[in-house]
Amino acid sequence: MNPLIIKLGGVLLDSEEALERLFTALVNYRESHQRPLVIVHGGGCVVDELMKGLNLPVKKKDGLRVTPADQIGIITGALAGTANKTLLAWAKKHHIASVGLFLGDGDSVNVTQLDEALGHVGLAQPGSPKLINMLLENGFLPVVSSIGVTEDGQLMNVNADQAATALAATLGADLILLSDVSGILDGKGQRIAEMTASKAEQLIDQGIITDGMIVKVNAALDAARALGRPVDIASWRHAEQLPALFNGTPIGTRILA
């Protein structure tokens, strides 16, 4: 069975309850299914807390974090360090053999600078599946942070949804974007079960999908197109439904190419 990438987002990394639910679901799933799993994570909340503590400004442009040269080291420490090792610690606590990686390990995802105006923000493209496939074949759970590196050795902060998409393309994997919201909501706050590109454009034009959710929806649409298969946006809050989700049952919004 092709691998499944679970991209973690939102306040999940900041919530012990959420992490407990997620890792319990992962244990249950791994006990009953052979499907290889990969976790990709960002950690915006971890970065925001650190920046606040250091009295550094947080700037965003079109939903993407602006990353000046003097901040990339701090952001790398937060994402590839604190956030990544927090997840490895939870995996250890639940007796899951895991390995912490960043996008540059084994050239798994190739990264170039997205836009000079954004600073050290990277564009992710598919890379080599060798390292991660080797880990999966040996029963490890790869936990991959959304920090990448360019050919000339510049560290880059990559939008985690886009990083997960590039890695899914690399591995031929299915993709779930797991966050705080149970999916995409319509104007009345009701979950939308399925979403096409035209429906997404309509909701963006109407101002119903805004800010970070635009980035998330576009990343999911890009992923669905790139992978040639649906991508799920769902919430970690319904832990009892997660094993079904990991097995292909939609519980949030299914994004169609």
Swiss-Prot record:
Phylogenetic lineage: Bacteria, Pseudomonadati, Pseudomonadota, Gammaproteobacteria, Enterobacterales
Any one GO biological process: arginine biosynthetic process via ornithine
Binding site for ATP: 180-185, 208-210
Alphabetized PANTHER family for the sequence: N-ACETYLGLUTAMATE SYNTHASE (PTHR23342), N-ACETYLGLUTAMATE SYNTHASE, MITOCHONDRIAL (PTHR23342:SF0)
Keywords: Amino-acid biosynthesis, Arginine biosynthesis, ATP-binding, Cytoplasm, Kinase, Nucleotide-binding, Transferase
Record protein name field: Acetylglutamate kinase
One cellular component (GO) term of this entry: cytoplasm
Residue(s) at site: Transition state stabilizer: 7, 216
Superkingdom per UniProt: Bacteria
Subunit structure, interactors included: Homodimer.
NCBIfam families registered for this protein in UniProt: argB
Gene: argB
Catalysis: reaction(s): N-acetyl-L-glutamate + ATP = N-acetyl-L-glutamyl 5-phosphate + ADP
Role this protein plays: Catalyzes the ATP-dependent phosphorylation of N-acetyl-L-glutamate.
Positions of substrate binding: 43-44, 65, 157
Keyword Nucleus: no
Family: Belongs to the acetylglutamate kinase family. ArgB subfamily.
Source organism per UniProt: Salmonella agona (strain SL483)
Gene3D superfamilies: Acetylglutamate kinase-like
